[in-house]
Amino acid sequence: MSAEANKALVRRWFAELDKRNLAIINELIPEDYLDHNPPLPDLPPGREGVRESSVRLLAAFPDAVHIINDQMAEGDKVMTRLTTRATFLGPIFGFPPSGKTVEVSGIAVHRVVEGQLVEHWAHLDMVGFMEQITPSVVPDESP
């Protein structure tokens, strides 16, 4: 596939997730998918890990949307700089939902082989994300 076709495939992946079309996982993610930075702990490997993380993340952030800010491709790799925006409506990482809108920026790199996303690296602003989902604590300043 060409670099442009690979970029289109990654855009389709995010667009289908935004539509809550989890059937896309069977189409675009092979059983032996390799995620170098899984989004959640204790996930099974491969396609099943992608499915489980998608279900868990959508339970916490059911209206999540991915905004593609920039995209580059070379060879079989596609780099996507994106922003994910969602409302925190379900528990995650042990934190109760706040109902607040959260936003996290990051970079995802996918390796594309024969029309499938076979490998993934991600670097997200997890500090900013955690600051948005953790309850605010105001320190007691009394003497």
Please identify what each model-predicted range represents.
Residues 1-143:
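C-terminal and inter-domain tail/linker signature
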